[in-house]
Amino acid sequence: MTDVRDPDISDSPPQSMEALGFADQFLVWSVRVWAQSNNPDGTAPSHYYKLMREAFAKAGLKDTHLVFDRFMSLFTIALKRPLVFHAPNCSCLSRQELFSVRLVANAQNDMLPCALGNLETYIAATGVRPTMNALMEFSQDFAREGILLEQVPDLEGPENKFRPGALRGDMANVTVH
């Protein structure tokens, strides 16, 4: 049997930030900065908000940081599973960071049933609709500015398996390391 797959397309997930394209890196960095602003590290949260606001503006997304903040807030308030995000300058990738790339890519590519199903895996049913609305709004803003995310495979392995988590209404389910 002849292998007709494109040799430039990998079935394996990216293992580091460097393996991602710019749009994917920008989203992962944004998620990390947002998470860091909500997990005290001795730096004032306003520092991270300012950093994100400036980065979004430079990318042509002047007010999108507000919609992104709304999405992340709604998403984390309705969490039913713990999340792990790396520090903004870390080269590693977590399963949840790749999930965020796939989620936005699904929204940008009109794969809404897939995006909806993925959201339902992570958040309580009561949070799905408002979170999906915010996701659609900021992912369309990204697309209008040419920030198009790629479909990336999921990470596998025991270190990335979910731990059972109770529904939480705070940032206790979000870890930055």
Predicted segments with their positions:
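Polar/charged low-complexity regulatory segments
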Residues: 1-101, 105, 109-177
